[in-house]
Amino acid sequence: MSSHADSKPWTVPALAQAKRDGRKLVMLTAYDAGFARTFDANGVDLILVGDSLGMVVQGHESTLPVTTADMVYHTAAVARVLERALLVADLSFQADATPERALDAATQLLQAGAEMVKIEGAGHKLDVIRYLVEREIPVCSHLGLTPQSVLRFGGYKVQGRGEAGEQLRRDAQAAVDAGASLIVLECVPTPIAAQISAELRVPTIGIGAGPGCDGQVLVMHDMLGLDSGHRRPKFVKDFLAEGGSVAGAVQAYAQAVRDGSFPDAEHAYAA
């Protein structure tokens, strides 16, 4: 467990300080109090209540059916037990379609206990990010493979190869300029993710984006080797197999992120 996690709760400014200090950030999803409590006690710095709950908890084929009410319910359950980890919650599909709708949904999530909201995509979402930050709501920008755009992408595919990598770099910088305090990069080639991470002043969290990011996140079911009913992505590693228990798996995952052994080339995408 990191020295920070041993001493005091994480805050948004502390995330930027961790990047400056070269300290890797450990993030996991959680959707209920029991797992959240275990993750919080075993070295996880940030917990994401993700709309991935639509697939791994509710059994849907995508995240699209998840509602703001679903997100509020699970966010509140997780928030009640956290002592150190910073809590991030997703804005569900189309909850951020306009700045006003995003403010309503984000307000509900913060009232439920979230400390930051995550928004997928760039483009017109930059206005949403700016609108929320101007109203004192911390924002995480999710770029690369954005699951809410799965229909447009034609499936879950690596993003940012070739010329698209340069656009991804521009999108990441634009999100930070709009006020984002954290960037999630999903299914992005390792060299591009590393370049983006080096260029930005805020931390990047990778999921299938290689070891050059400032931290890593996995869906808890993937980290524990549970069958989610969907094809396992290349970047997934079962830490329960080596950890022997849920707490042991979390500790093994956290240590691997911090010492840089996860993700390795086997769990990342080349250019």
From Swiss-Prot:
In the record, the note on similarity to other proteins reads: Belongs to the PanB family.
Q: What does this protein do?
A: Catalyzes the reversible reaction in which hydroxymethyl group from 5,10-methylenetetrahydrofolate is transferred onto alpha-ketoisovalerate to form ketopantoate.
Q: What is the lineage of its organism?
A: Bacteria, Pseudomonadati, Pseudomonadota, Gammaproteobacteria, Lysobacterales
| Cofactor, how bound (note) | Binds 1 Mg(2+) ion per subunit.
Q: Which organism encodes this protein?
A: Xanthomonas campestris pv. campestris (strain ATCC 33913 / DSM 3586 / NCPPB 528 / LMG 568 / P 25)
InterPro entries per UniProt: Pantoate_hydroxy_MeTrfase (IPR003700), Pyrv/PenolPyrv_kinase-like_dom (IPR015813), Pyrv_kinase-like_dom_sf (IPR040442)
Q: What are the catalytic residues?
A: E186 (proton acceptor)
Entry-linked PANTHER family: 3-METHYL-2-OXOBUTANOATE HYDROXYMETHYLTRANSFERASE
Cite the binding residues for 3-methyl-2-oxobutanoate: D51, S52, D90, K118
Q: How does it assemble?
A: Homodecamer; pentamer of dimers.
Q: What is this protein called?
A: 3-methyl-2-oxobutanoate hydroxymethyltransferase
Q: Which GO terms describe its biological process?
A: pantothenate biosynthetic process
For whether the record's keyword set contains Transcription regulation, the answer is no
- Positions binding Mg(2+) in this chain are D51, D90, E120
